[in-house]
Amino acid sequence: MGTKIIGTGVYLPKNVLTNFDLEKIVDTSDEWITTRTGIKERRIAKEETITYMATQAAKEALREANLSPEELDLIILATLTPQKRFPSTACLVQAQLKAKGVYAFDISAACSGFIYALDIADSFIKSGKAKNVLVIGAEKLSEAVDWEDRSTCVLFGDGAGAVVVTRSEDKSDILATRMYAEGSLEELLHADNCGYIRMKGRELFKVAVRSMEEVCREVLEKAGVKPEEVSLVIPHQANVRIINALAEKLNIPKEKVFVNIQKYGNTSAASIPIALHEAIKEGKVKRGDLILMTAMGGGLTWGAVLLRY
């Protein structure tokens, strides 16, 4: 019995904030942002709530999966920007989908949230407790940044991505997962008392590259897969320098690493499902391909998922 992705969906706010727009807000420049992060623009939700964005992404994923909301057994939503303290955003999405009675909860693992949630979904399916699971990563980070702090406000964007996974008897499967957390390093990336994102970029860069390389090698070894056998790496879209350094450490050519950070910035838990959806639609992922996903986020949290699409 395997866990198969049968539908993906995204929602990206229509409002685009470019680096040139940011030049008018803080002391920065397009050149400074691009050379250090790879980001050219990001989406900013104005009227859209996180519940709305997550629901739209979920509806697209369900349509592609040819499932009705009532056929779901579980909804897991990863976010660090929930709409309310409670109830969970997953419950709000459940109501919008009219998925009456479907088990729903949020998880908080920052930028690692989506792969944490996918790991949980895989466990539910393989234990026999669920057949169809909706996994969502959604963020409204524009409400969590200090727009006077040029070191962070240039990095983040809003959006949502969703996947539907189901029990499968074919070759498609989540082959290996590994998740980690290290709370003693929380000061490297955290929210301050005002709820604004604060980070120590240089220290975080080193930890991120090393930790993601190690966990990627761990899941590859667990599955008996060599790095050169991977069809596509879909990393969390945090910083193009981190992505490039990770690819170099794993000795994986850049053409086998998916990057869309230039369009959306860092969307935290939403970044990997958005990237997966785009990679599929662009023909860069096909059935039978080996896909390696990895992320690091506040916590610190990090992990990797190896799947056969």
Swiss-Prot record:
Subcellular location: Cytoplasm
Gene Ontology CC terms, in alphabetical order: cytoplasm
Catalytic activity, EC: 2.3.1.180
GO biological process terms held by the UniProt record: fatty acid biosynthetic process
Positions annotated as active site in the UniProt record: 111, 236, 266
GO molecular function: 3-oxoacyl-[acyl-carrier-protein] synthase activity; beta-ketoacyl-acyl-carrier-protein synthase III activity
Superkingdom of source: Bacteria
One Pfam assignment: ACP_syn_III_C
Location (main, coarse): cytoplasm
Family: Belongs to the thiolase-like superfamily. FabH family.
Complex formation: Homodimer.
HAMAP family (UniProt xref): FabH
General function of this protein: Catalyzes the condensation reaction of fatty acid synthesis by the addition to an acyl acceptor of two carbons from malonyl-ACP. Catalyzes the first condensation reaction which initiates fatty acid synthesis and may therefore play a role in governing the total rate of fatty acid production. Possesses both acetoacetyl-ACP synthase and acetyl transacylase activities. Its substrate specificity determines the biosynthesis of branched-chain and/or straight-chain of fatty acids.
Name of the protein this chain belongs to: Beta-ketoacyl-[acyl-carrier-protein] synthase III
Organism in which the protein naturally occurs: Aquifex aeolicus (strain VF5)
